[in-house]
Each structure stands twice: as C-alpha cells, then as structure tokens.
C-alpha cells in the first residue's frame, strides 16, 4: 500500500468523525469547527489521492506494477506514468550489467569449476547481460528483487554452464599448452547460457581471462613445459649437428677437388696466429716459424 493511500484513509476517517460532530445537535462553535475540519480533511484526502495517481520511473529502469501486492503483468519504462493510488511500482534495473567474479584482496569471488582430469580450478569470469523488459513482470513474480535475479538466475546458470564446458577440458593435453582454450570455452559457456535464460535476459558475452589450477595440476603442467623445452633444445642440437656434418662433407669434397683450399685455410690460420705461412705450400721445405718481435 502506498503512503498516499494511507494518508487518504486517515483523512477520510478524520472527515467522517468531524462530520458527525458537524451534523449532531450542538452549539454553533462546535459545529463550525467540525465543518472546517471536515472540509479540510476531505480536501487533504483529494490531494493525496491525486498525488498517488502518478509515478516516475528512473533512467535505464523498469517498474513492475502491483495491485495490493499482486503483479498486474504491466512493466513501465523510464518516464512519467499514471496509475491508481492503491497500485505500487517496484523498480528493476534495465541497464547493461557487468558482473565480475575475481579475487580482490581477501575477497575471492572466482567460480570453482571441475576439469576433465577430475581436478578443480578457480576461474576469473566476467559477464555482460541485460534484463528484457517483456520478461520483467515474470521475473519479479519469481524472484521479487533484482538482486535475487542476479544471484539465482544469472550466477547459478553461469556456474552450471562453465562446469559443463570445462568438464571436457584437460589442462594436461599438449594441444592446450600451445594455444589458450579459454576464449573458446567462454564462448561455449555463453551459448549454453543463452539457451537456458535467453528468453528472460540478453547475454552479450562471457569472458574467462585466467584460471588458477590446483597445485598438483600446476606442477604437472610445469613438468610438461620443461620436457617440451628440453625436447626443443634436443631437436635444435640435432639440426645443428646435421648441418655441421653436411658442411664438413662439403668441405671434404672441396679439398679433394681443389688442394688450394687447404693452402688458403693454412695461410689464414697462420696469419691469425702470427706464424709464417711459408710452410703452407705443398712441396715446400720451409717450416712455419714464430715471428719474434724486434728481429
């Protein structure tokens, strides 16, 4: 019951009592005062009744209209609206909602999910959604308040959808170590959520930027990454050895085909070491000597 209708009832009662004193035989002063009170009470009741015939709905809000507590099935958008004084309006937020389930300080609101390897993890999740005005009366009848819609409709179904998609996700699968599967898993969760609650709310997107595994799974992932790194190093060493062997083979063939290659390599090495290159020519009796400074 609105406050206007309460004051209307009070004014009517006062007017009724004053009217009795006005109509009953009594002195002129009493009757005059009773008449004044009656007229004033009736006028006040009319004013309060008039004030109860209008309501204003705020920006980006819906208002659910009820008559004596029973929903009428009418939802009002933002603006100025007329109604009966005995009708009440209940606001519902019609703006786009951005809900984040993250860890901030000592408050941890992350969603627990069970993975394909039977371990559990904590997922950082954000979701953008908006209430549909056409579904607002039904949602009010089921959940009464907007916060109950968020907790019992959005959060509960979001948790169910995330657990459904993460049940098929194995964090130890090598394919999941190359490319993060979180964007595709979040998209699938959003699709499931749209199927479940899409008739009542608009689901714009679901995001899972990070996920924290339990310690056992984290250790196994680190071991896999170390093994993959060692394998990469071994493969690179193998390719280097193969390239070196091929280079040696090419060099060996070039020496056999052209002895001057040996002479050139000898001269280069002798010059680099400060040794005389005289002994590098085939058939030469000279021996390489070490240059003595100052002689």
Swiss-Prot record:
Q: Specify the species.
A: Mycobacterium tuberculosis (strain ATCC 25618 / H37Rv)
Which parts pass through the membrane? Answer: 2-22, 37-57
Question: What InterPro entries does the record point to?
Answer: Band_7
- Write down the membrane topology: Multi-pass membrane protein
One annotated GO molecular function: peptidase activity
Q: What is its EC number?
A: 3.4.-.-
Which GO terms of type biological process are on file? proteolysis
Q: What is this protein called?
A: Protease Rv3090
Localization (cell): Cell membrane; Secreted, Cell wall
Q: Which UniProt keywords apply?
A: Cell membrane, Cell wall, Hydrolase, Membrane, Protease, Secreted, Transmembrane, Transmembrane helix, Virulence
Q: Name one GO cellular component term.
A: plasma membrane
Source organism, top-level taxon: Bacteria
Covalent S-S links between cysteines = none
Q: Main location per UniProt?
A: membrane
| Purpose of the protein | Protease that triggers late cell apoptosis and contributes to the pathogenicity and dissemination of M.tuberculosis. In a mouse model of infection, can induce hepatocyte and lung cell apoptosis and cause pathological damage to the spleen, liver and lungs. Specifically stimulates the secretion of inflammatory cytokines including TNF-alpha, IL-6 and IL-1 beta. Can degrade casein in vitro.
Q: Which residues form a coiled coil?
A: none
